[in-house]
Regions:
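Terminal alpha-helical anchor/extension segments at protein ends
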Residues: 1-136
Length: 136
């Protein structure tokens, strides 16, 4: 439309970008869920994701916006866990961290993976609010 002002053009462009991003995010979550369901290179849920982070296997860490969780880390090895019952290490060998999700983000980036923060996706919420597509 030739009569659109600059403000209207920007508003429409921004809306198109938001829509494209929402579609990309939905496709990414769908891919994650499908890979995990097939037993392929993906995991969902905090415990399995933290194990994959600890094993340095995460290619893409996918997190629901605002997801935080208390947990523990072995600073020497980088082992991260939210549930002490799943830890091969004793509690006194681990340092308490306020947010293991943030720790997982930092570890994933340091290991060359990338992180996607996803807003308002019910499939990801139902899968435990966190998942990872794995390198192997």
């Amino acid at each position: 439309d030739k009569d659109m002002g600059e403000t209207e053009v920007r508003r429409r462009a921004l809306e198109l970008l938001r829509q494209a991003n929402a579609e990309r995010e939905a496709e990414l979550v769908e891919r994650l869920i499908n890979l995990q369901a097939m037993g392929a290179n993906a995991v969902v849920g905090l415990d399995d994701v933290l194990q994959a982070v600890s094993d340095k296997r995460v290619e893409a860490l996918i997190i629901s916006d605002g997801f935080r969780y208390h947990g523990y880390i072995d600073e020497a090895s980088g082992f991260v866990v939210s549930n002490l019952a799943r830890s091969p290490l004793a509690e006194n060998e681990l340092a308490e961290v306020e947010d293991v999700v943030d720790t997982a983000v930092a570890a994933t980036v340091a290991q060359g993976g990338h992180v996607e923060i996803i807003a308002d996706n019910l499939a990801l919420e139902d899968a435990g609010r966190i998942g990872a597509i794995l390198r192997y």
